[in-house]
Amino acid sequence: LALTNFSLRADNSSALNGYSPGNQLSKIDGLELLNLWGKQPKVVQNLFTLIDTALSQSKKCTYANVARDQKVQEFCKRNNIRHLGGPMLGCVTQNGVKVWVRTVRPATVKVKIKMKGSSKIFGPVESSEKSDLVASVQVDGLKPGKSYSYEVLIDGEPIPIHVKTSITTLPVDQKIRIAFGTCPHRWGLGNQKQADRILKHKPSALLMYGDLGSQDKNEHVGKHRSDYQIRDLFPAWQSLSGSIPTFTSWDDHDYFDNDRSGIPKNFTNKDRLAVRKVFSQAWNNPSVGFNDDRGGIFFRTRLGPCDVIMLDNRYFRTGEKRGFLGNGQTEWLKEQLLDCKGEFIIITCGTMWTDHISKGKDSWGKFDPEGREELFQFIEKNRIPGVLLLSGDRHGACGFRIPRPSGHTFYEFEAATLGGRSGPASGAMKHPDALYAFGSTYAFGELNVDASLPDPEVKYRLIHESGKVLYELSLKRSELTPPA
């Protein structure tokens, strides 16, 4: 599927067809969103229109409707289109990665890794209507810290990939770079300048944990899927996800709508399960919450010297004590914290850890300050070292020290700037514990970890899409270890 690569200035309103990155962009949909960063080729526009029509027939539509839609299938056959999304990398280790692909119809998917003088085939994995036409192929047996070119084969034929992509395994040494951020709100995933900047920094992984690829579609899972289709047609997202392994969790806008959580009023548990299924199939994560009826979107993984725990603050929320994460996820989190062996532990939450922005609106401060205190005391009592708190939701970017009665200080870093939106985070410097505050700018967070030092160190940086470092702070592991 030939896609034109656009590289327009994200901070120039003309690059966004007259829109500014604010509430206006939250309301646009369909072709208007697809063409936001520049007019897509006619074949891409027509393909999306056909898929969107197939997915809009009812609130329960899946990619089975696409696979069975005669107009979609005839169009794809006529234009030699065999995949609708991907390749998207995830679940990276020192020896391998998973490659996610969405096909046009049920198909056999393989991945060919090119090595010196030879190649190796991984798979096959079958995409099906049940899997939402997704196949995730496990690639393993690779060497640590090496880059490999690759091809995706669908029914034995390589698909054209019109952006530069490669697989890079995790390094074996104790140094790693991890990019992160939240709130692209769909359109930020089309920002080629920002994608190019992240790619230039060559992070081993990208963590995104809220307000990502679907926007306020409530229980209409067909429209959720249509939003993800736009994501997969953005050249910027193709170039980023085809080379940088991505790990994701969600927040309110991916979930149902603004500030919604638990089972929202006038909706059902069946609706909640359906939305969870869309999210879990649309991303390439190592796991998704509990592997039973309890559900959720959370997991733990290891990236070099770092344990990464990505939390779900939406699915289980009740407004009661321990109701922010739910009892089950809270106990799971404690078990994971005690089991972590990395020099640093990165914990992501889709909303703010502190109450300093909007008085804790839609976050721990309003819903579960007791649960937050229980968690902080647990970390302190067990002297769990190296904990870093990453947050999102409040548009803009801000950071805080969190001084504790124990004498320990937690650090919170937020980079809710992947969509360039203005928001309350830009006013954070009014608080005495604030570290930085920015708004109305495209930027991403970055953690540079060096665990080879006698006292391992992490350097946080907030990086503008232009490459300018807006803020940086270095912390020793000893500074992130609660006192005895």
Where are these regions (language model features)?
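Metal-dependent phosphoester/phosphodiester hydrolase catalytic core
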Residues: 1-484
